[in-house]
Every structure is written in C-alpha cells, then in structure tokens.
Amino acid sequence: MARGPKKHLKRVAAPKHWMLDKLTSVFAPRPSTGPHKLRECLPLIIFLRNKLKYALTGDEVKKICMQRFIKIDGKVRADITYPAGFMDVISIDKTGENFRLIYDTKGRFAVHRITPEEAKYKLCKVRKIFVGTKGIPHLVTHDARTIRYPDPLIKMNDTIQIDLETGKITDFIKFDTGNLCMVTGGANLGRIGVITNRERHPGSFDVVHVKDANGNSFATRLSNIFVIGKGNKPWISLPRGKGIRLTIAEERDKRLAAKQSSG
C-alpha cells in the first residue's frame, strides 16, 4: 500500500501543455504542492529550462534558483518544482525581466514579457466568500490567497486586482455581461472575448456565452471564465494574437501572407 504523497510523475502522464518530448527520458518534474493544481501549473524548472532556455539541465536550474534570482509574485522561490500558474508574475532581477503566465490560444502558457510597472500587480478570481471566526468576512482567490475584510461589494466569480508588495486589494471587476474575460479551462482554453450572457442551471453547471473580437461566439462553464477587464479594455497586457483563435484555414492564410511579405 502506498503511504504518503506521490513523488514521481511519468513523462507520458505529464500535462500536454508542458510540451515535453516523451521519448528522451522516463520521468518529468513533479510540481510541489502549492497554490495551483498539478494539471494547471508550470513548474519553475520547465519555465526556465524549456521555455526560456536559460539552462540546459535540471542541475543548472537548481543553481540559478539557489542564488535567489527568481521571484514569483514578489517572493523569492528556490524550489525548482514550484508550481507557477495562471496570472503569476515571474521576475528575474539579474536580467531585469518580468513575465506573466498567460495562456495562448492553443491552451499553453506563453512566454509573455511585461513592463516593471505591470509586474507590481496581478488579477485573481474570487473562488469563495465566507464569514470566519468572530464574524470576520474572508475571501479566497484562485491562487489560494485568503484575504480578510474584503469590500462587501465583491462577490464570487468577480476579479480582484492585488498589489503584490502589500497583498492588498486595490480594485475589482464585477462578473457581468459586457466585460472582457479569458477562458482558463475546457476546449476554448486561452480564448478572450466579451461575456454576452449567462445561463443559470440550478443543480448543474452555469453556462456563459462569450463573443470574441472577430465576432465568433462560443460557450463554456462559469468555472472556466476569468474576467480580465471592464468593458473591452483589459487590465493586463495580452499575449500575441490577443486571444483570438483562428481556424486552420485562417492560420494557413496568415502564414502564407507572412511568407510572401518577407520573401
């Protein structure tokens, strides 16, 4: 009988969006326990070694982390398998670079560079609101932060803007039709659009209908929706493609046009 937590992860069972080749070795880095789920996170080692190519091996990543160069959400993280996830800000002081983990339209974490100004805050989705001991209201976010005494106007599924230095809420966006959102799960993962309406299904999953900038409509579960802006103005900078998923034919035409203009 297995006792205790699992310590290994086979490469073939690793999440697809890490984009690890299956045949080079047997194991993949198993993310530590942390604020994001195993299937929805990106361990630091994969970000530094496979995405940024700052290291060739796991040992090199360990040497970088042990020098305390890497900060996630303003805190130094020396664990190479620390699970960074959606909306996290990764800062590398040595190079002066800041990144925000955001999905591209293919549902993978894009290497999205941001300005030092934007690296001071992050957006969090409100997962739960409850009243704790002595009647103190609490709020729990998608990245497992618990904040006491939030603004009473903030409700579930809203998005709050958090100042990373103080951990305090600076602003919030209501979950409402007409606001810009990003899909963080399901088949439409990584798409960005404006919420058009919400279907309530008591006892089942609420469905949200979204329309992207090209006028394409799609629907997804409420739990997959993350509001990122008021009206159609995003509060964060968006990765290349602005969250608009192209069909295979559109992608081909775009590639050919780029080829002709460069050729």
Swiss-Prot record:
A single BP term in Gene Ontology: translation
Any one Gene Ontology molecular-function term assigned to this protein's record: rRNA binding
Keywords: Acetylation, Cytoplasm, Isopeptide bond, Nucleus, Ribonucleoprotein, Ribosomal protein, RNA-binding, rRNA-binding, Ubl conjugation
Segments forming domain S4 RNA-binding: 42-104
Transmembrane segments: none
Lineage per the UniProt record: Eukaryota, Metazoa, Chordata, Craniata, Vertebrata
Subcellular location per the Swiss-Prot or TrEMBL entry: Cytoplasm; Nucleus, Nucleolus
GO cellular component terms, A-Z: cytosolic ribosome; cytosolic small ribosomal subunit; nucleolus
Summary of the function given for this chain in its UniProt record: Component of the small ribosomal subunit. The ribosome is a large ribonucleoprotein complex responsible for the synthesis of proteins in the cell. Part of the small subunit (SSU) processome, first precursor of the small eukaryotic ribosomal subunit. During the assembly of the SSU processome in the nucleolus, many ribosome biogenesis factors, an RNA chaperone and ribosomal proteins associate with the nascent pre-rRNA and work in concert to generate RNA folding, modifications, rearrangements and cleavage as well as targeted degradation of pre-ribosomal RNA by the RNA exosome.
Family: Belongs to the eukaryotic ribosomal protein eS4 family.
Primary location: cytoplasm
The protein's assembly and partners: Component of the small ribosomal subunit. Part of the small subunit (SSU) processome, composed of more than 70 proteins and the RNA chaperone small nucleolar RNA (snoRNA) U3. Identified in a IGF2BP1-dependent mRNP granule complex containing untranslated mRNAs.
InterPro entries, per the entry: KOW, Rib_uL2_dom2, Ribosomal_eS4, Ribosomal_eS4_C, Ribosomal_eS4_central_region, Ribosomal_eS4_central_sf, Ribosomal_eS4_KOW, Ribosomal_eS4_N
Keyword Membrane: no
Species assigned in the record: Oryctolagus cuniculus
Name of this chain's protein: Small ribosomal subunit protein eS4
List of residues that carry N6-acetyllysine: K233
Cross-link (Glycyl lysine isopeptide (Lys-Gly) (interchain with G-Cter in SUMO2)): K230
